[in-house]
């Protein structure tokens, strides 16, 4: 699509320049803005303990890793974090990746090839869809959150290996994947189930162990687990968790791991501190749950059309891309930042305001958001 066409269809993307740290309020364009579009779900990106750990990591390791993990970039800090994350999600091994995007591409391409097939939810994150397309395997998309559609697709395949891929929490609507049903279907057809838990880790399940734990499942049902560190954990990077053989396979074959400079060790030190906060400060999840309930109850009373989501992601469906952009602009004029999500990120005709809540927000701030929505709609 040409740039001019994007502009006329209200699909043009812009960057905003922040002038300070993440938080419920942001410094932007010379003024304070109340933001409801961050993925910093637990409010840890600017936590004093995380910041102090990062600075300690800089003092110990410097600011850059200098090389890929397989050369001289893998530090004791990286290794310690991998072990801590493995214990947290209840898996034998974890492998750190620089980003969630590279983790998903690396896993899928390392595990399947031309004689295989990958089955993906139609609304999976772009990194999962790209991973499936680039792997060279037969690529099938099943209907959103529909395990029977997946079952029909698996019935028709004669592929050597079968990989089922889903988000744990879908990033644009906040809905949970039906993991127990997907796991049962995958098991029946001898397929691997891969869950990208970018938006569930830290938020769902006991002690924030994610969407797989939320459903009472484990490695036997979902052998491949991907998590990101830049959302609820408030830092940067990603990881893949699973059995010993999976991790060793990725070390040998995942090109996005082999040929990428390792993240700074200081980030690993900061993430370890953040992980301890996730484990010990359950009040953050409790508060987030209360704020979600407050927002949904208020929205229902106002007649707002929300997606059915129990997560911090609370999209307000608009439909038309231009209308969504105008609503976002009206909110910004009132000092509230909510991003308009438009095609191709979401299907045509389903543009929305992607409202996200965090533990850093207050009840008064959520009430202000509801009041502003009434005024702009």
From Swiss-Prot:
Catalyzed reaction equations: 6-carboxyhexanoyl-[ACP] + L-alanine + H(+) = (8S)-8-amino-7-oxononanoate + holo-[ACP] + CO2
GO biological process: biotin biosynthetic process
CDD domains in the record: KBL_like
Residues the entry annotates as binding substrate: 13, 125, 345
Enzyme class: transferase
One Gene Ontology MF term: 8-amino-7-oxononanoate synthase activity
Residue positions binding pyridoxal 5'-phosphate: 100-101, 171, 199, 228
Cofactor needs: pyridoxal 5'-phosphate
N6-(pyridoxal phosphate)lysine modification, residue list: 231
Family annotation (PROSITE patterns): AA_TRANSFER_CLASS_2
Matching Pfam families: Aminotran_1_2
Keywords assigned by UniProt, alphabetized: Biotin biosynthesis, Pyridoxal phosphate, Transferase
This enzyme's EC code(s): 2.3.1.47
Pathway the protein takes part in: Cofactor biosynthesis; biotin biosynthesis
Top-rank taxon: Bacteria
Family: Belongs to the class-II pyridoxal-phosphate-dependent aminotransferase family. BioF subfamily.
Its biological purpose: Catalyzes the decarboxylative condensation of pimeloyl-[acyl-carrier protein] and L-alanine to produce 8-amino-7-oxononanoate (AON), [acyl-carrier protein], and carbon dioxide.
NCBIfam families: bioF
Quaternary structure and partners: Homodimer.
Name of the featured protein: 8-amino-7-oxononanoate synthase
Gene designation: bioF
């Amino acid at each position: 699509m040409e740039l001019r066409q994007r502009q006329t269809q209200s699909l043009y993307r812009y960057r905003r320049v922040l002038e300070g740290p993440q938080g419920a309020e942001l410094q932007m364009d010379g003024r304070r803005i109340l933001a409801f579009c961050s993925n910093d779900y637990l409010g840890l990106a600017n936590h004093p303990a995380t910041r102090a750990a990062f600075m300690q990591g800089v003092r110990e390791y410097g600011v850059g890793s200098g090389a890929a993990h397989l050369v001289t970039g893998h530090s004791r800090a990286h290794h310690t974090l991998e072990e801590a994350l493995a214990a947290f999600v209840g898996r034998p091994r974890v492998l750190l990746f620089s980003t969630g995007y590279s983790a998903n591409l690396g896993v899928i391409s390392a595990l399947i090839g031309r004689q295989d097939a990958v089955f993906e939810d139609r609304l999976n994150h772009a990194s999962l869809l790209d991973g499936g397309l680039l792997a060279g395997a037969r690529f099938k998309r099943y209907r959103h959150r529909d395990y029977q559609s997946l079952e029909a697709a698996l019935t028709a395949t004669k592929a050597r290996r079968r990989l089922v891929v889903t988000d744990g929490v879908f990033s644009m609507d906040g809905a949970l994947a039906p993991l127990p049903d997907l796991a049962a279907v995958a098991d029946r057809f001898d397929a691997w189930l891969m869950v990208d838990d970018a938006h569930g880790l830290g938020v769902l399940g006991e002690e924030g162990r994610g969407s797989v734990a939320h459903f009472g499942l484990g490695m036997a049902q979902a052998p491949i687990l991907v998590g990101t560190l830049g959302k609820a954990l408030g830092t940067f990077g990603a990881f893949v968790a699973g059995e010993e053989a999976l991790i060793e396979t990725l070390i040998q074959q995942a090109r996005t791991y082999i040929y990428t400079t390792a993240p700074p060790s200081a980030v690993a030190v900061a993430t370890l501190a953040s992980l301890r906060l996730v484990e010990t400060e359950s009040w953050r999840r409790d508060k987030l749950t209360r704020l979600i309930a407050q927002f949904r109850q208020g929205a229902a009373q106002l007649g707002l059309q929300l997606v059915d989501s129990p997560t911090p992601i609370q999209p307000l469906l608009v439909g038309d891309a231009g209308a969504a952009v105008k609503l976002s602009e009206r909110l910004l004029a009132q000092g509230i930042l909510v991003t308009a999500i438009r095609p191709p990120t979401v299907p045509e005709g389903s543009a929305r305001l992607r409202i996200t809540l965090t533990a850093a927000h207050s009840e008064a701030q959520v009430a202000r958001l509801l009041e502003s929505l009434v005024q702009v709609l």
